[in-house]
């Protein structure tokens, strides 16, 4: 499979970087399922560079926050979901070079392939230029996300938030069990079952890795817990029948009583 030159030109413009060695970009876009030099080594390099650049940016932006907050914010910015979003901003999928199997199964849209390609492009830019140029490019890609990110509980992953919620109430931790694995080794899908005593339902979730499936399951449980808590609030707020009867505004007047009062006045 070859890249459409027009798509490649559009991608270069969106990336904001013109390669001195265009073949580096082609390699960064080549999945290992395709023939020829693929992007895994570039991905390894780009992953490390991205982590460093984002860590430094957060270190400078939040001078009073501790290592825990900085780590959670960095994880939020460099996680697969975020990188896949960046890739979609560039319409990266239309430029990926995939093998026949990946092409047929819709690899252009697969989150894991998109995130790997972004990291590979970062590695390619570094080799084609230098760390300062690479840093400036990464910061331009993540500018909006760096502006809005804040330290706090929202940066914790779903499994951590669920664990802290349960521990704070002395409830046993959930159990995660892989109940199915499908696909080839390079393109697997994991199905995880999660149970916790805090809800009656058994949650089933899927992901391209065991970790992602477990995180998705934890997120679903958190959503169910929040839903139950909202319903409990509604029940507490809604006035009962007895409360309405006790309220003078809802009490019917007694005609005979009114007559007695009238005659007394006379």
UniProtKB/Swiss-Prot annotation:
Residues 253-266 have a biased composition (Low complexity). Disulfide bonds: none annotated. One of its GO terms (cellular component) is cytoplasm. Residues 8-130 form the RNase III domain. Residues 229-266 are annotated as: Disordered. It holds the Pfam family dsrm. Its cofactor is Mg(2+). Keywords: Cytoplasm, Endonuclease, Hydrolase, Magnesium, Metal-binding, mRNA processing, Nuclease, RNA-binding, rRNA processing, rRNA-binding, tRNA processing. Mg(2+) binds at residues 43, 116, 119. One of its GO terms (molecular function) is metal ion binding. CDD domains: DSRM_RNAse_III_family, RIBOc. It catalyses: Endonucleolytic cleavage to 5'-phosphomonoester. It is found in: Cytoplasm. InterPro entries: dsRBD_dom, RNase_III, RNase_III_dom, RNase_III_sf. The active site is at 47, 119. One of its GO terms (biological process) is regulation of gene expression. Belongs to the ribonuclease III family. Homodimer. PANTHER family: RIBONUCLEASE 3, RIBONUCLEASE III. Digests double-stranded RNA. Involved in the processing of primary rRNA transcript to yield the immediate precursors to the large and small rRNAs (23S and 16S). Processes some mRNAs, and tRNAs when they are encoded in the rRNA operon. Processes pre-crRNA and tracrRNA of type II CRISPR loci if present in the organism. This is Ribonuclease 3.
């Amino acid at each position: 499979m070859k890249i459409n030159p027009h798509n490649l030109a559009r991608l270069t413009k969106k990336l904001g970087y013109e390669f001195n060695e265009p073949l580096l970009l082609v390699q960064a876009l080549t999945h290992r399922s395709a023939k020829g030099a693929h992007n895994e080594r570039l991905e390894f390099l780009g992953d490390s560079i991205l982590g460093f650049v984002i860590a430094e940016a957060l270190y400078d932006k939040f001078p009073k926050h501790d290592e825990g907050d900085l780590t959670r914010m960095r994880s939020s910015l460099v996680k697969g979901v975020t990188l896949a979003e960046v890739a979609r901003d560039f319409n990266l999928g239309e430029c990926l070079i995939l093998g026949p199997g990946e092409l047929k199964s819709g690899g252009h849209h697969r989150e894991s392939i998109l995130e790997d390609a972004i990291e590979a492009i970062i590695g390619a830019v570094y080799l084609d230029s230098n760390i300062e140029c690479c840093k400036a490019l990464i910061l331009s890609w993540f500018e909006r996300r760096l502006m809005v990110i804040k330290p706090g509980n929202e940066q914790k992953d779903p499994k951590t938030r669920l664990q802290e919620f349960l521990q704070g109430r002395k409830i046993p931790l959930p159990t995660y069990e892989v109940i199915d694995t499908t696909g080839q080794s390079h393109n697997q899908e994991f199905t995880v079952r999660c149970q916790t005593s805090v809800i009656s339902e058994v949650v089933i979730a899927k992901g391209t890795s065991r970790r992602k499936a477990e995180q998705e399951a934890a997120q679903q449980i958190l959503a169910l817990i929040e839903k139950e808590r909202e319903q409990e609030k509604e029940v507490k707020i809604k006035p009962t029948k007895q409360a309405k009867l006790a309220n003078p505004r809802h009490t019917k007047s007694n005609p005979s009583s009114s007559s007695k009062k009238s005659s007394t006045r006379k």
